[in-house]
Structure formats: structure tokens, C-alpha cells
Amino acid sequence: MMIAACLLGPSRGLAHPLGNFSINQYAGIRITSEAVEIRYLVDLAEIPTFQEMQDWGIVATVGDASLERYLPGKMEALKRGLRLDVDGHPLSLQTVSTEILFPPGAGGLPTMKLGALYRASLSSGASGARVLHYRDTNFASR
């Protein structure tokens, strides 16, 4: 009975378990014989979203014209913060797609979710075991 109450009870705090100042990142890495793909997601809580809106003059509405200049530049900057090496050689990531969402947050403030699919081709001449090293240097001070 207690389990049901926990599962069905209020879910306050699930969106940003570290609070409304948090920035959470996720990188899903898919490796094939031809390429490495990184599905990169950044979840900004209410305060970082507000700061981005103020700094960049964006409107928290999907499709707003302000996002046409913001999103490509932001995702390029985030891509520069990712390091991907195979067998000690850096790979060049290319942006395949980007997306942005503004889920509602606490107190009626928006939050922001940024997403990108990055892809790097692998050289076709290599065979056998290979070593991949990934590093995310974005938001290092947080």
C-alpha cells in the first residue's frame, strides 16, 4: 500500500532533483562501424532558463523568431565543449539536428530543454578493438 501511495503521490521536484538552479546533461552514445553518434541533452531549470532568456533576448515559445539565432549558436558552442577521441585521435563532430522545448516549471516560470544529435565518421580502414574516450567540458564550473 505504501508503494502505491509513493507512486501515485505528488511528484514535486522530479523535473529538477537538484533544484531550480540546476543544469542537467545527458549524452547517449551510439557506436557503429561507420560513425559515432551523440544524442546530447541539456535540461536547464527555471533560473538558468531565465538567465538565458535575459542574456540572449529569447522568448520561451517554440517557433519564436528569437530562437532562430539562438539555437544554432548555442548548440555549436555546446558541441565545442564535447571531446570525442578514438584510439587517441580526435573526431570532428557534425550537427545532424537540434531541438528546443520549454516545459513549465515551478512558480509559472519556464524551463528549457536543448537537444542535439551530433555525428562523427569513423575511418573505414581500422579493424579490431578500438578505444573511445568521451569528455563533456560544458558547464564545468557548475
List the predicted regions and their residue ranges:
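Bacterial N-terminal signal peptides
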Residues: 1-9
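N-terminal soluble domains immediately following signal/targeting peptides that reside
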Residues: 14-142
